Amino acid sequence: MKILIADDNIQKQRVLRTCIEENFGSSDITQTFSFTTTIKALTSSVKFDIILLDMTMPNYDSKEPMNNDGKMRTLAGQDVITKMAYRGITTPTIIVTQFEVFGRHSSLKPISEIAQELIASYPNIVKGYVLFDLQSELWKTDLIKKITEL
């Protein structure tokens, strides 16, 4: 199974990778840490079976040359999904986020609502979301179930 984990949090990536390896055996896992490197991975010749996608990532990896826009992109995951649809990439994608709400002040929106909108708009791509929490094991059960159902 070829899996792309797109997340800027190294610890979260490590925990996700361990969860996959423990429950699905050895997998070919590619890791990206920004919006740009995620798009590059998706448009490369590699075809992934599953994408685990964080919702908030920087525009560029901090190690990329000419990185003068490493600002956080609050809805990077949503933007990745939109680009996937535009390019005809329909790899099953599970959003894995630590945040329950996105936005600012009066424009706050819960991840459950964002995910439902994405599932409705891109049903061939978005297969749900998992609320990641290092203090709990519930996210693992949810993620394993969602991957198994694919």
Curated annotation (Swiss-Prot):
InterPro entries: CheY-like_superfamily. One of its GO terms (biological process) is defense response to virus. It comes from the Bacteria. Keywords: Antiviral defense, Phosphoprotein, Two-component regulatory system. Probably phosphorylated by DtcA. Residues 2-150 form the Response regulatory domain. The modification 4-aspartylphosphate is found at residue 54. Possible phosphate scavenger member of the two-component regulatory system Detocs that confers resistance to bacteriophage. When the system (DtcA-DtcB-DtcC) is expressed in a susceptible E.coli (strain MG1655) it confers resistance to bacteriophages T2, T4, T5, T7, SECphi4, SECphi6 and SECphi27; the level of resistance varies, resistance to T2, T7 and SECphi4 is not very high. Consists solely of a response regulatory domain. This is Detocs response regulatory protein DtcB. It comes from Enterobacter cloacae (strain JD6301). The gene is dtcB.
